[in-house]
């Protein structure tokens, strides 16, 4: 649930807050495919479809799009359950995020040992 501190000048949830949560949710999915840390290298196709309001219950759904040698591409879809409209569930945002596996020196590494 997002709070009033997360709002923009229009009284809806600031897009940057949603992007931050997309990044976190996608990283959890990416980590399923490597024992290394992952870093975000790109956010593609970000689409804010509908606003998110204070009090909405927001859910993030992830799925693998592509597994490369060092990278993982993840689709993240965001839904909001409206607290004021009979618990209506609407898709509010989607994005594809690319993560790269890195070592302790922040150098890209293979997702899995050879």
What does each of the following model-derived ranges do?
Residues 41-51, 59-65:
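Conserved interaction-surface patches within small, structured recognition/assembly domains
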């Amino acid at each position: 649930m997002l709070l009033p501190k997360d709002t923009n000048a229009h009284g809806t949830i600031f897009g940057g807050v949603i992007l931050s949560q997309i990044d976190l949710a996608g990283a959890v999915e990416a980590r399923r495919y490597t024992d290394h840390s992952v870093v975000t290298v790109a956010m593609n196709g970000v689409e804010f479809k509908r606003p998110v309001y204070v009090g909405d219950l927001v859910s993030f759904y992830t799925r693998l799009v592509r597994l490369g040698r060092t990278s993982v591409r993840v689709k993240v879809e965001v839904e909001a359950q409206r607290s004021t409209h009979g618990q209506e569930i609407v898709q509010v945002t989607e994005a594809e995020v690319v993560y790269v596996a890195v070592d302790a020196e922040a150098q890209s590494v293979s997702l899995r040992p050879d």
